[in-house]
Amino acid sequence: RTSKPYQPTDQERKLINSTSGLGTAARQYSRPVSGPTLYSFGSIQAGEVRWKGMVISAPTGTAVKAIASGRVILAGHLNGYGYMVIVKHGDSDLSLYGFNQAVFVKQGQLVSAGQTIAQVGNTGELSKPALYFGISRKGVPVNPAGWIK
């Protein structure tokens, strides 16, 4: 059975096209880790549950880099995501980095684009090492693929 690629809702399209801390989706940021995408935004995770970010395969211990400068609002364990770092960009954009084996930043810390913030692990819901990467705009998960090269 083949499933159709995920199509954003009208609300998601409006959010993606609005400007905020990360700007419009123009593939302007480097990937947080190099590696193939295991799961894309909107693909089926289990039953009717869909991924709200993307999962990128990378070896355990690979450096996870912030895609843009911002302030860390969470650095620690989050159920389902393992060790997670969430960076706030501007007023309403968040980048999320999960499934890590180690976190190198603290809540409240300012980070720069390209700064190592964590190490890839398998502390989330997968049995193999990978990075969960997501972007949220105004509290709504949006497809992060549009922002990264």
Named regions from a protein language model:
Residues 1-81, 86-88, 96-98, 136-149:
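Extracytoplasmic/periplasmic cell wall- or extracellular glycan-interacting regions that localize
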Residues 40, 75-76, 103, 120-123:
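Residue-level recognition of beta-strand microenvironments
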Residues 51-52, 99-100, 121, 130-131:
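Short beta-alpha junctions and helix-cap segments that line functional grooves
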Residues 62, 95, 123, 127:
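Ser/Thr-centric signal marking residues that sit
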Residues 75, 90-110, 114:
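Short histidine-centered loop motifs in beta-beta connectors
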Residues 107-149:
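Conserved, short, structured surface segments that act as functional micro-motifs
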